[in-house]
Each structure stands twice: as structure tokens, then as C-alpha cells.
Amino acid sequence: MTESFAQLFEESLKEIETRPGSIVRGVVVAIDKDVVLVDAGLKSESAIPAEQFKNAQGELEIQVGDEVDVALDAVEDGFGETLLSREKAKRHEAWITLEKAYEDAETVTGVINGKVKGGFTVELNGIRAFLPGSLVDVRPVRDTLHLEGKELEFKVIKLDQKRNNVVVSRRAVIESENSAERDQLLENLQEGMEVKGIVKNLTDYGAFVDLGGVDGLLHITDMAWKRVKHPSEIVNVGDEITVKVLKFDRERTRVSLGLKQLGEDPWVAIAKRYPEGTKLTGRVTNLTDYGCFVEIEEGVEGLVHVSEMDWTNKNIHPSKVVNVGDVVEVMVLDIDEERRRISLGLKQCKANPWQQFAETHNKGDRVEGKIKSITDFGIFIGLDGGIDGLVHLSDISWNVAGEEAVREYKKGDEIAAVVLQVDAERERISLGVKQLAEDPFNNWVALNKKGAIVTGKVTAVDAKGATVELADGVEGYLRASEASRDRVEDATLVLSVGDEVEAKFTGVDRKNRAISLSVRAKDEADEKDAIATVNKQEDANFSNNAMAEAFKAAKGE
């Protein structure tokens, strides 16, 4: 009886393919923490690591009594045991599935689990496949994060088991699925209609939206009425959104989409809502070197130019005044509805130091401050409120030329001046230093009437004439032709530096601060006076003689 049973067992083994790598069916007879015991009808039961029976979530996929396919690793491993592998059996099954899918052009399910040069790796039931980057979608996809880790459908486009080479395409699946849907969409699509779609890709200039077999471009300028730096501020890959068809080129199958067009245009009649001079609050959305943008309502931004940020510092960087996100008060300066531009002012909502100065200072008032800078045309003095006043070169000294007088001053010096003029609108304050003292020129002219004989000292002379110092800070000019009664063509022949000169004050040019002198006119006047004196004396003598003769005649002498 025993011999016949052993004989029958040996014969049954012959019927089983026992070469290494063969696939046999077994029954799960026991499950332990680390191993699963499988009876495949061989000489002994085999212990297979439990890990080989777990799914991706780490859960056992079998229970006692289940039939499973396993691969023969070895019939006897030297200890009389048979080694089986569930992992190799699953891999064998996976290849069979792939071959069938490849031959029948069916889809397979897999997961994108890595990135390699030129594409991605996909796990297909334990088989590693290659997905070229160009076959991920019908359009180039830069970011695949929204696809990784998800179960997706693929088509096998190349299969070589010997070389363990599998190439798949997701694009082929999408094109196949979209074909019927695409035809229907293209037939019904019209400009102006609202459609739903899935954001599938973002670029710097917009987003591509899958409308169902047809991709449309949602340009960045059509995402929102407000300023958008990058599409990711408005939409993300995978978002389902409603958009409006703006343009549809049926022949080239190009669709332009709009998101902002779903709402009303906030720029319509904006000038009526915000007349020039209106003060309102807004949020700083962006900073540039030339200013900052402030959103005054949803979809409407205005520019505060750097020159409109601060009353006193025209070149201050915007980041020193405001930060992105700040809520600020601004004034509407100008609106160009056609160009969709609004000019806003920040400083106009603060006290104007120029206006304040104009209201608190009059012409002639004395002010003091530190010299902030010295330029080719004058001295800038710092005043209250952070503003500057200018002392022009011509207002530094009565007596010394501005270019020379300015050398007596340096940056940081405390200096006093007189207010000459205030133009708050043009933000200009004119100051004078020389006006702190009386004008010697005007004083001299007031004390000396035209025609008076004056004296002075020659300080400079050339052929054309001589400069004569009449008083401290007051000079007159004596032309060569006026230097003598005699004809003089070269003043140096009759005058020298240091000579005391007595001349007639013949004229004044207040604008150019020039006094005209004449020795000739003085001499002529002297001569005329002398003649008049002589004539007067002669007349007196004649009169006296005549009276004497008459007296004698009366006496009868």
C-alpha cells in the first residue's frame, strides 16, 4: 500500500513542471507574521516571505485557503525544501498582462513614481516602464506634481521582455478619450459662451485649460482686471474653472479664454466714481524703482509715482515709504480711462510743508538753518518741515561777486537769511544773505543826488575807462572820454590806480547797479561857475561905478 502511494506521488510530480522559473498553483495553508506557508503539491510545503503578499498599502492580499500562483525558485535547496516566490509569479503575470494589452491596444494602469532624463518612470504592477516627457500629455507639461502618485491609464507602445524594456504613453490615452468629446465640443463651441475646464499647465504668459479634448489659452492679461505677475496668483494646475470663450479659430483649432470677462469691467465710468482730488484708502500691491501700485478696489490699481510720495525727497525709494500689503491713504490725481491708468498721490494726504511755510512766513522775515548743499548757482539751506530754501549766488553779498563770496561757506554751516519769495505751488523758496544788511548802493544813491560832485579813488583802469570806489561796496565808472576836458582816447594816460578823483555824478542804472561819473562834466561845470562868478563881479563893479558917476553929477561936480 505504501509503495503504491509513493509511486502515485512520484507520478503526480512528473505532471508538474518543476524547472526553476515555472509557475505553479498552490494553496495558502498558514499565515505567520513574517511568512506565508504555501502547499504547491510538491514534496514539501514552502515558506514565502509575507512581504510578497502585501499590496502597496502594506496589507496582506490573501487568507488561509486561497489559491495563488507562485514561481519555482528551486525544487530542493540542499536541505530538501522547495523554494517558491510569489513576487516572481506576480511579475510573470504582469508581463502577460502587458503583452496582451500591447497586442490588443488596451490600456494599463500605472503610477508615475520618478523622474529620469527625457521623461518619467511608471510602475505597472511591479514592472518599471519609461514614459517619455513628450508623451505625458497632448501639450508639453513642465510640472507633473499633480500627476505623480496617482493611478493613471497608459498605452504600451513598446515592449521587450528580454531586455526588460517597456515604453508607455499617456498622451495616446488622452487623445483616444478626447476624440469623440473633442468633435462634439468643436461643433458647439462659440465665441462668448461660458465653458468649464481643468487647468492643465501654467506658463509665464498664461494657463492652458482643458475644455474636454480641446485646450484653450487663458492669457495672463485676461485672468483678472487687476495687475497679475504670474498665473499662479489666480489659478493652479488641476483647478476646475469657468471661463468665457473670447476668440475661436475653428480652422486652426485655437481657443482664447477669459476669466476676468465673467465679471463687470471695474474701469467703466471710474472717473465718475473717483473725481480728481478724491481721497481714499487702498492696499499696496507692488513696488518698483519708479513708484508703487495701490489697489483702490477689486481689479483697479493706480500708480503712486516716486515724485508723489514725499514732499521733500523726490528721489526716495518706494521701499523706504511703504511695503507691499500696507493700507494707505491716497489722492486721485488723474485718470486716463482709455489707457486704464490712474495717477495717485501719497504726499497729498499729508501736510504740505511748502504751504505751511508760505502761511507762516512773509517776505523779509529772517530764517536760520544749516547749509545742506552748495551748487554752481547757490546755497541750499535746510528749513523747518524738511524743506530747502535757495540763496542764489547774486544774493550772497552786496560787494563781492557770488562765485567768490560762496567760497566763504561750507556744508553744515549755520546760516541766517532773509525770505525774498515763496512759491508753494512750485515748491520754491528764495532766500538772501546780503539782504540782512542795508544795500550800500541804494544808500549812496539816496545820499547823493544826480549832478552832485563826488570824490573817490581809482581801483582799476584800462584804455576804455576807470573804476572808482566811491564808498565801501559802491563803485562808479569813469569812461575815458569823460576823464578830462581834453580829448582822451586812453584813460591810462591820465589816470592811475590810487588816484583821488573828483567827478560829477551823471547817472545811475539801478538794475545793473552802475553809477556814471564824469570829470569833464565836473570841469565844465566848474568853468561855467567861475565865468558866472567873474561876470557877476564885473556887473557889480559896473553898477558901483555907475552909481558913483550919478552921485557926482547930482552934486554938480
Swiss-Prot record:
Q: Which residues carry this modification: N6-acetyllysine?
A: 229, 279, 363
UniProt lists the family membership as follows: Belongs to the bacterial ribosomal protein bS1 family.
Gene symbol here is: rpsA
> What does its record list under induction?
Represses its own translation via the N-terminus (at protein level).
Question: Which species?
Answer: Escherichia coli (strain K12)
Q: What happens when the gene is disrupted?
A: Essential, it cannot be deleted. Upon depletion cell growth and total protein synthesis become linear.
Subunit architecture: Part of the 30S ribosomal subunit; the largest protein subunit, it is loosely associated and not always found in ribosomal crystal structures. Does not bind rRNA. Probably requires ribosomal protein uS2 to associate with the 30S subunit. Binds in the junction of the head, platform and main body of the 30S subunit; the N-terminus penetrates the 30S subunit while the C-terminus faces ribosomal protein uS2. Nascent polypeptide chains cross-link this protein in situ. Can be cross-linked to mRNA in the ribosome.
| Domain S1 motif, chain residue ranges per copy | 21-87, 105-171, 192-260, 277-347, 364-434, 451-520
Places the protein is found:
Cytoplasm
Q: Which Pfam families match?
A: S1
Q: What does this protein do?
A: Required for translation of most natural mRNAs except for leaderless mRNA. Binds mRNA upstream of the Shine-Dalgarno (SD) sequence and helps it bind to the 30S ribosomal subunit; acts as an RNA chaperone to unfold structured mRNA on the ribosome but is not essential for mRNAs with strong SDs and little 5'-UTR structure, thus it may help fine-tune which mRNAs that are translated. Unwinds dsRNA by binding to transiently formed ssRNA regions; binds about 10 nucleotides. Has a preference for polypyrimidine tracts. Negatively autoregulates its own translation. It is not clear if it plays a role in trans-translation (a process which rescues stalled ribosomes). Evidence for its role; binds to tmRNA with very high affinity, is required for binding of tmRNA to 30S subunit. Thought to play a role only in translation of the tmRNA in vitro. Evidence against its role; overexpression of whole protein or various S1 fragments inhibits translation, they have no effect on trans-translation, and an in vitro system with S1-less ribosomes performs trans-translation.
Q: Which GO terms describe its cellular component?
A: cytoplasm; cytosolic small ribosomal subunit; membrane
> Taxonomic lineage per UniProt?
Bacteria, Pseudomonadati, Pseudomonadota, Gammaproteobacteria, Enterobacterales
Q: What name does this protein carry?
A: Small ribosomal subunit protein bS1
